[in-house]
Amino acid sequence: MIGVFVNSKHVPYARKIVEGNKLYESRTKNTLKKLVGKRVGIIETGNGYPMIVGEVTIGKARFVTKRMWDGIYRALSCVPYGSEYDASGEGKWCYEMKEPIPYDEPIFLPKNAIRHGRAWCEFDI
């Protein structure tokens, strides 16, 4: 399985994704482009050991200008104004989070997970 890391230290972004409340995941770089169209696990990080909290299908990737971000995508991404994840400079990459399914019980990320940079990994469960 493929998993995407979502920092949830201050805001439960990973849970918001799998519960269907966070419709877009945003990144400063196009780090999830290889995952568009794939079913992935959402890995909650920032609160101890990484946990897989559910699954989504990653939809279209689009570069969103700062103006578009401020107009609509900030709200769809559940990112508060002034947060460390707020858009700066030219804008951000936004990925649709489709068909979310939360797990009844989170699963510990296996220790043998193969990381692909800081954005995602592969593992067997």
Where are these regions (language model features)?
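Structured alpha/beta reader/binder surfaces that contact nucleic acids or chromatin modification marks
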Residues: 1-125
